[in-house]
Amino acid sequence: MKIGKKCLFSSDVIIRTSDAHSILNGEGKRINKGCNVTIGDHTWICNGARVMKGTTIGSNCVIGSNTMIAGINTGDNVLVVVNPARVVKTDINWSNIRIIE
């Protein structure tokens, strides 16, 4: 697992690099091997999000609340939400400083 600099993780986030159990084929060989997870710099993983094996999240991204993201590469500067996870906005930025207008 690789996590970039200045990331923000809300509560109840789960990051998994494996299924935590084995699934075997008819010959007794494991078919669900673990895979790396990579999270870029300045990425915000919101409350209840699940980041599963084989996922690469780019830099400056937001993964929405309760989103399950599995085995995809998001690219940079995107908002990813819903299940199954999909990019819904591109060319985004975020700040942990509250802006009052």
Where do the PLM segments sit?
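Flexible, glycine/small-residue-enriched loop-and-beta-strand segment within the central core
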Residues: 1-56, 67, 72-74, 83-84, ...
